[in-house]
Amino acid sequence: MNSRVFHEGYDVIVCGAGHAGCEAALAAARMGASTLLLTGNLDTIAQMSCNPAIGGQAKGQIVREIDALGGEMAINTDCTAIQFRLLNESKGLSVQSPRAQCDKKAYQFRLKHSLELQPNLLPFQATVTGLIFEGARVVGVRTNLDLEFRGRTVIVTTGTFLRGLMHIGQNKNEGGRLGDFSAKTLSASFLEAGIELQRLKTGTPPRLLGRSLDFTKMTEQKGDKEVTRFAFHDTRDVEPLFHVEQTGEQRLGWAADSNQISCWMTYTTERTAELVRANLHRSAMYSGEIEGIGPRYCPSIEDKFVRFADKPRHLLFLEPEGRSTNEYYVNGLSTSLPFEIQREMVHSVPGLENAVLLRPAYAVEYDFAPPTQLFPSLESKKVENLFFAGQINGTSGYEEAACQGLLAGVNAANKARGAAPLIIGRHEGYTGVLVDDLVTKGTTEPYRMFTSRAEHRLLFNHGSAEFRLAHHARTHGLLTPSRLARIEDKRTAVLKWVAFFENSRIEGGRGTWGDAIRRATTGNAAPVQYPSEFLILSQAIQEEVIYRISYAGYLAREERQIAKLAQIEKIKIPQYIDYKSVRGLRRESAIKLDIVKPQTLGQASRISGVNPSDISLLMIVISATRA
């Protein structure tokens, strides 16, 4: 045996311990797969490299879906949050999204502790430098310690570290995050295997010293009095998070009677705009130093003043990074300008005139693998047993990374034991939409999830994730029998009360309870006085019942549309079809179909540039292969 081979029997090896890697490792281990989690630094596991927050528009729903599939992000957020808010509370339930500010270090340490306690899982500090192949299969990894680890499957969750290059003005440093080294040699393994790589860019704002800020010149943004948590079940426990006498923090980290910490709002000024415009030539993004494309929906301050030149000012949020630190994150001030300009820019903002910068803003560009090279299971089409999740697939955000990591972990464990993969449909949740968009359409810029990307978003209210995904959790063994039983009890209660309200008339009133609820929802009637038996139910059950009744007509229409689309989704496309030889198929369509290699006719229909006549031709070809 090769003396460098440390272990030859892992089912799953995860490369990288960010938000995708942690969910991947936990999911695989919880399914019983022997799992190795490799990271360059055990002390930066699950680090919040950018803003110290989880959730938000569509992202909050994704976190709920992660919880419904047995993931950790929701629980970890509930246990380490310092502020909770429900976004879009004045709007309909379908677009309401939970969001939480987290204690950055507590989030990181609690998740590290959870990994350490998980059976079947070994977190190990080593940097992956290359992959080991046997033919068109991956069979292990090499590390900087001159050790090799062998495994049946490998998941790559390298974030921004693949040939990461940080920019502050004209200054460049190798690294995927300030203070951490980049993975310089791993990209060569992908290229060796024929996997295409491209470059993307992201950025982060400066961090400020809280005691140097003048909050009297800002607007306070408090947390909600009625807290909306992320996890569907009670997550409280009293195990010590830090095993030292000086701290009272528990693994819970938050309780109903504890004080939430406020965020603060302020605005840029004309002086801020002048500084940015006068120094654009010194910005790494505008001087030609950066090749990668940045995030459209999280633009740098340079982009804001260039792309939205008509706006006189831009909103900034001062977000606390934790209970045990005085550091603040300046949401909205991402930049790659030189440090001296950053400081002037910060001082031009009301309340920040005397701010002390603790860390500079910077941009980072990195390699990513265009995700059309993946199957919907997130396994590589070119290298068997190799899975990708997170920013390496071109996404942006902790939540987008985490849900991919969970799916990759489940599917790698399934592949190792010869089981079918977990595929979530577009009609089942934002996670399904995200993966389908990535593997079918690809992306040329950091992909962020929005409610508008989901055609069936009315079905994706944050409270319904358990009901939508429980059958997947049951099939793949992702939840305990007791929790699955609780979900079924909740489902039974919801269906019972929906039926009661729709079929029972209000004594002395007009129509049924359901009619009254719909009138109240549209503002055309006074609030409904619900029966006491209904009001003693959990808030989650009450909200789901009211939602289903309020939007009954719309939800029924969505279900009919899904039923129609289901027929085309069921038609499998043989993977041996040579699209270029299909007579009548346009050349553009043939090229795109050959790149994506869709698994179903439904997936083929969503490829950009493939039109209905192309789908009709494919139906004929598929029918002929079956004859």
What is each stretch, according to the model?
Residues 26-133, 145, 157-177, 181, ...:
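Conserved N-terminal/central alpha/beta ligand/cofactor-binding core
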Residues 41, 188-343, 440-510:
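An anion/pyrophosphate-binding glycine-rich loop and adjacent beta-alpha core
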Residues 302, 317, 323, 329-393, ...:
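A glycine-rich dinucleotide-binding beta-alpha-beta segment and adjacent secondary-structure elements
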Residues 401-422:
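Internal hydrophobic alpha-helix adjacent to the cofactor/substrate pocket in enzyme cavities
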